[in-house]
From Swiss-Prot:
Reported function: One of the primary rRNA binding proteins, it binds directly to 16S rRNA central domain where it helps coordinate assembly of the platform of the 30S subunit.
Protein name (database record): Small ribosomal subunit protein uS8
Family, similarity comment: Belongs to the universal ribosomal protein uS8 family.
SS bond list: none
């Protein structure tokens, strides 16, 4: 069976890994997933990620915990294949009054809502991370 929405699969793997207190989770590799993992690392939501290139490339994420609680309290998919959500720069969401991030796919690549506002860009809202 083919995977219909790989980003939702990635988000679900992160959620399940954190609820099971896993330190390392793995998933099939794609450039989009790598970009999202890079943003999560830059914003301090995960410790690190690496790409293992065997027969099938794999993306491995090192999850981050603080006082035995996951750093990512909530991660939610917004735009999905059945219902794409696009926002202009003025209408980009402010997640948790700036404490969380929205990951946005823009014409300049994948970036946070804060960075998209500085570049005056809108785009597709991929997910919220709190």
């Amino acid at each position: 069976m083919s995977m219909q929405d790989p980003i939702s699969d990635m988000i679900t793997r992160i959620r399940n890994g954190q609820s099971a207190k896993k330190e390392l989770i793995s998933m099939p590799y794609s450039n989009l997933k790598k970009s999202i993992a890079n943003l999560l690392k830059e914003e301090g939501f995960i410790l690190d990620y690496k790409v293992e290139d065997n027969k099938k490339p794999t993306l491995k994420l090192n999850l981050k915990y603080f006082k035995n609680n996951p750093v990512i309290e909530k991660i939610k998919r917004i735009s999905r294949p059945g219902l794409r959500i696009y926002k202009k720069r003025k209408h980009l969401p402010n997640v948790m009054s700036g404490m969380g991030i929205a990951i946005v796919s823009t014409s300049r690549g994948i970036m946070t809502d804060k960075l998209a506002r500085t570049y005056n860009l809108g785009g597709e809202i991929i997910c919220y991370v709190e």
